[in-house]
Amino acid sequence: MKTALKLWSLTFLLSSTVLSGQELKQASFSADQAARGSELYQQNCAACHLANLTGSFEAPNLADTGFRSNWANRRVDEFVDMLQRTMPPQAPGSLDQSQYLDISAFLLEANNISASATALSLSAGSVLFLDNKAGAARVLERRTPVPGLAGTVPSPGTRNSVPEIATIYQSERARTRSFESVNKFRNVSNEELANPPAADWTYWRRSPQSQGYSPLDQITTDNVGQLSLAWVWGMEPGRSQPAPLVRDGIIFIPNFGNVVQALDGRSGNLLWEYRRQFPEGGRSGGLLRTLAMWEDLVYVATTDAHLVALDARSGAVRWDSEIADEALGYSNTSGPIVADGIVINGISGCGRFFEQSCFITGHDAATGAELWRTYTVARPGEPGGDTWGDLPLEFRGGADVWMTGSWDPEMDLVFFGVAQAKPWMSVSRGMSADDAALYSNSTLAIDPSDGRIVWYRQHVPGESLDMDEAFEQVLVDIVGEPYLFTIGKSGILWKLDRRSGEFQGLRETTYQNVFSDINLETGEVRYREDIRNMQVGEWLSVCPSTAGGHNWQSTGYHPPSRNLIIPLSQSCMEMSPREIEFEVGSGGNQGDRQWMPMPGTEERFGKLAAYDVDSMEEEWAIQQRAPFLTAALTTAGGLVFIGDYDRYVHAYDVETGQELWRTRLATSAQGFPVSFAIDGEQYIAIPSGREGGSPWRIGSFLAPELQSPNNHNALYVFKLSP
């Protein structure tokens, strides 16, 4: 077996040893260095760590006691070396050493270290934060973990020329440029959202049931080899996992940086572009995954915790509602859904300790007015409020809603997955694995009219390894009976009765060693004992890793074959909990990780498998070295389309798994493929991008011979050759 390549980011810690016989001194820096570093930080770091350094998602706070404690008496050269190897995530090592030193100087200033006349350098004995109580300087001892043991210019063919005049719409936080009138767009009714026309893709997974299935059948198993490129559109650089929407041949696609574009689906011409403008000192940039539409509006949940309605024909802002305070870390990573005239959105960025926990909101689709708010953290004195140990409300972190939900129009229920409690590991959050922490790691069934939780199913109570169950809820009727299928990072496929949430079955899809007991009759799981008894600073080796199992790359359902097609990831990790301070504004993920190959897979990190919805049996599986980084798109032509880290897009026979066609893109295929039709001609659209979270990192960390070039985000559109 090849030796696993191990890389570390700001959140990663390894065991440490003491460097003795060396006089420690606080690193110095100049004011000029800090000023340059501030500008570099805003350009390269603020999208993840935020302008105020408080951090978001997996990016830690860089100006709190946890950061200072972590780097106390650790050498400046060690810190700069780590930055050079891992930052910025989309292009590690892209800055020169002096620029990394400038950023380090800015971080010192932000942590109340005063500037001096002496510039920051890599001199021996100079430590990032001097702490006389912490002992001698520490250096990292790299350990070999053992699984299972404790311890843009338009592309040719898109826009023909830059228009001389564009109509400009300016709002308080956005500017829209409209180049062409979108006259052929027809309003999208409630009835069409419930049952979309075959030619359109009006939900993030086409239908409100989140099946990712297109009923178009012009492209088949017999002719898919004749697919050719129709056009390409170059997208904004940055972390990108977009899910386009299509109506009447108009593509609406989210970009990094809170940019939304409308494209002509036949030619690739840009029709209008909405670009978010962020106030000074606030969040900038950020990932957008999904959009929603209703009537003549397109809805965007922005990374500064706003919900925005755009005019579908012009891109002009119709309304803009703040749903949370971005200064507290709140954000949106995925978009809302619309259910019968109500826009329903889940908030994320809830890792910090504040009383205002995560929630799901319902809004009037026409005005943006908030109709209801349902918290995903059970409050003291309410049902489930006693499942958080003795923690007061302000220290109940997590339960983010970071993926988009589903809607059953007949039952009039919406379904959302809720992520894990935070910090990731139970001992870090002052709890045990027996503290369920409702409603984290659950599927929620919600009445869209008032936000009432009709039922919930907590898949892994007391989840303690950042293996959340926050992903797609696929709604399937089997012989007239309504079911819900969902799968999380543990790789367990869950089957529920969607009327009640009652457990109906499960299937393990990848190797796992975190649960010592899985009750096949009830679905109850129990962690192995060393996980239940974890201690701060001790390492646990677990499978799968936080990449999954399964992650954001959504399942596709193929009704004719009754198969669920699931993108899976095969890797393991070693993980260690940190100690945190229980102070308002503290918190975060507070766990350290190293990734490694999964035993028995021959270092094939990507898996695509089909599961029969009746028996839950695996029908076929494909394993390869490159991780799969798109959702699965299934079609009535008997095909499943999917893309991977190694830049390939594949078309497989949905019933056998036989590969029938593939092509290669400029960078990793990443996001949510869609299919649509214009004048009876079927198209397949595949996004490319980088920085898909843990699933993308598996390729960059463990398969270094596979390359994912930077700055090639795009939308590739294919059709049959004439």
What label would you give each PLM region?
Residues P92-R206:
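Flexible coil segments in periplasmic/lumen-exposed cytochrome c-class electron-transfer proteins
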Residues G37-N52, I103, L107:
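The canonical Cys-X-X-Cys-His
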Residues V232-L245, E273-W294, D320-G335, Y375-T404, ...:
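Extracytoplasmic beta-rich repeat domains
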Residues S56-F57, N61-S114, A150, W201, ...:
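Extracytoplasmic electron-transfer domains, predominantly the class I c-type cytochrome c fold
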Residues G21-L40:
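Electrostatic cytochrome c docking/interface patches
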Residues N345-C358, F416-A437, W539, Q570-T601, ...:
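Short, conserved, GDST-rich strand-edge loop motifs in beta-rich repeat architectures
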Residues W201-R205, P237-V259, G282-H306, S331-F354, ...:
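Repeat-blade elements of multi-bladed beta-propeller folds
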Residues S161-L229, T376-P383, V525-I531, P597-M598, ...:
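Blade/loop signatures of beta-propeller domains
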